[in-house]
Amino acid sequence: MLSFTAQLDRVQLDSTVRLPPFQTEADKQAMDARTREAIDVAYANVRSFHEAQKAPAKTTPSKHAAWAPGEDVMEVTTMPGVVCTRFPRAIESVGLYVPGGSAVLPSTSLMLGVPAQVAGCKTIVLATPPRSDGSIAPEVLYVADKIQATCIVCAGGAQAVGAMAYGTQSVPKVDKIVGPGNQYVTAAKMLVQNEVDALVSIDMPAGPSEVLVVADASAEPVFVASDLLSQAEHGPDSQVV
């Protein structure tokens, strides 16, 4: 990863892995209060939504040794002596790919990281490309601390996907990789999900962003522009109309 990061991102690093706590005092000072507050509000909103998804619609406190005491389990007796159950189990380890080539995306970090945190994933690996000076955006570091990420992989592209899929001496192997990226990231995700040696799943192959906004004279121009920019910032191949 070090050689690919130097070759492709033109950043020289001594290590590609950072461990918590991720924010230094300099990182904290680099974030203004309004940005911190906006991230806190977004975190609370995303968390409240995914917290509501945890429990099944109809639950019964578990009485079986296979589940934790008091765990909510949906149980249905289909016929005498036959009980079917449904109960949630978190994926053991997940890899979150957060793009960073064209924009700082703490929003992506939240959308990927909060569900993993709420679900109870034991290992959360966040991969994001470093900036030209080798640093990671303070906003992304702040989110990584909030979601209690296991580590940050300071690398992007196919090499980051490969590191999470197969594992390295410093990067934990994950069971599932989620998150958007460019065509190289998408191709890498599709390749590793079909690799027997990787034994990793992905969320989906994410294509280039595109959006069509239909607006009339009553539309608020600032809102329309914001909707367009939110997609256009994803990359040079994004299409906004």
Residue ranges and their predicted role:
Residues 11, 17-20, 74, 82, ...:
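Flexible, active-site-adjacent loop/turn segments at secondary-structure boundaries
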Residues 48, 137-146, 165:
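N-terminal small/polar loop signature for handling phosphorylated ligands or for N-terminal nucleophile
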